[in-house]
A protein has these predicted regions:
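Structural motif
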Residues: 47-49, 80, 157-159, 201, ...
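Acidic, histidine-bearing metal-coordination/catalytic regions of metal-dependent phosphoesterases
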Residues: 1-48, 246, 251-254
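Short strand-coil-strand connectors
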Residues: 153-156, 215
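Core catalytic region of metal-dependent phosphoesterases/phosphodiesterases
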Residues: 10, 36-46, 52, 57-154
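Conserved beta-sheet core of the metallophosphoesterase superfamily
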Residues: 137-148, 176-254
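Active-site environment of divalent metal-dependent phosphoester hydrolases
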Residues: 56-60, 88-92, 122-133, 167-170, ...
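Active-site-proximal beta-strand elements of phosphoester/diester hydrolases
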Residues: 48-56, 157-170, 218-223
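Short, motif-level signal for alpha-helix interfacial/capping segments enriched in acidic residues
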Residues: 30-38, 63-66, 182-192
Length: 254
C-alpha cells in the first residue's frame, strides 16, 4: 500500500475517533451502557415547574440573579425547580461554595428561601459539577439529586431531563453548532438516538442556547455566564405549565 494511502487512512481513523469522542451519543448503539436512558430515574411531579441550567457558579464571583429567580418562582407559583446540570463552574468551586459543614448556601443563592418549593438537580458535565461520589463533601441541600437523567411524570405529560454533554463533549462546539449551524438539531438527534418516545419532551442544558421545538418536543434552558468571546449569557429558563402541556422561555432581569 502506498504511503499516501496509509496517511489518508490514518487521518480518517483519527478524525472518526475524535468525532466519536466528542459526539458520544453516536456510541450508544455500540455501547448501550453510555445511554443515560438505560438507568433513568422516574419521579412523579405535579404543578408548575421551572427548569434552569448552566449557572456555572464560581467561588470568586457573586451570583447576580438571586432576586430575579425568587421573583419568578414566587410570581408564577412554581412548585418544582429543576437545575439541569452545570450548577457550578468546577468541582473546586462547588467545594468552596458548598463544601463546608452546616447550612448549605444553595437555597440562598437560588432564591428559594421562604418558598414552598421542591428543588432537584441533574448531574452536569464532569468538568463542572461534583460527582455523586462527592455527596459527603458538597452539601447540595435542598436540591435532591436525580442522577444524570430523570423522567418526570406530570401525569399530563412526560418530561425527560438530561444536561446534554453527550451531544457534544466540548461545550463550545455544541454551542457553536446550535448557534451558527442548526439550533436544537443536536437535541433532536440525541432524543432519537437515545430512544426517547416521540410523545415525550426532553429538556436540555449544555449548549447555553435557549430554545423550544414544539414539533419535536425538545427544549433547552440556555446559560447564565459568559465564556470567553463565544458564549454570551442568555439568563433564561423554561417554565412548564403541565396542565396546558406547554413550555415558555422566561428571561431573568438582573
Amino acid at each position: 500500500m502506498y504511503p499516501v494511502a496509509l496517511v489518508i487512512i490514518g487521518i480518517l481513523i483519527v478524525a472518526v475517533t475524535l468525532f466519536l469522542l466528542n459526539f458520544r451519543l453516536f456510541l450508544y448503539p455500540i455501547l448501550p451502557s453510555l445511554n443515560p436512558m438505560r438507568d433513568v430515574k422516574r419521579v412523579s411531579m405535579i404543578g408548575p415547574s421551572l427548569f434552569i441550567s448552566d449557572l456555572h457558579l464560581r467561588a470568586d464571583r457573586t451570583f447576580q440573579y438571586t432576586k430575579a429567580i425568587h421573583h419568578i418562582l414566587e410570581s408564577r407559583h412554581v412548585s418544582n425547580l429543576i437545575v439541569v446540570g452545570d450548577l457550578f463552574d468546577s468541582p473546586k468551586d462547588a467545594l468552596q461554595i458548598a463544601g463546608h459543614s452546616g447550612v448549605s448556601p444553595i437555597a440562598d443563592i437560588l432564591g428559594l428561601q421562604g418558598l414552598p418549593i421542591n428543588a432537584y438537580f441533574i448531574q452536569g458535565s464532569p468538568p463542572h459539577d461534583p460527582s455523586s461520589k462527592e455527596d459527603g463533601t458538597v452539601n447540595m441541600a435542598p436540591l435532591v439529586r436525580l442522577g444524570r437523567c430523570a423522567l418526570l411524570d406530570f401525569k399530563e405529560m412526560i418530561v425527560i431531563v438530561y444536561h446534554g454533554h453527550d451531544m457534544s463533549w466540548k461545550g463550545a462546539i455544541g454551542h457553536a453548532w446550535d448557534r451558527f449551524i442548526s439550533q436544537l438539531s443536536l437535541e433532536r438527534t440525541w432524543k432519537r438516538v437515545a430512544g426517547v418516545p416521540d410523545s415525550d419532551w426532553v429538556v436540555f442544558g449544555h449548549t447555553h442556547i435557549p430554545g423550544i421545538d414544539v414539533k419535536h418536543r425538545v427544549a433547552n434552558c440556555g446559560g447564565w455566564q459568559p465564556v470567553r468571546f463565544l458564549v454570551h449569557p442568555a439568563c433564561t429558563g423554561l417554565f412548564l405549565s403541565p396542565e396546558n402541556g406547554s413550555f415558555e422561555i422566561v428571561r431573568f432581569a438582573q
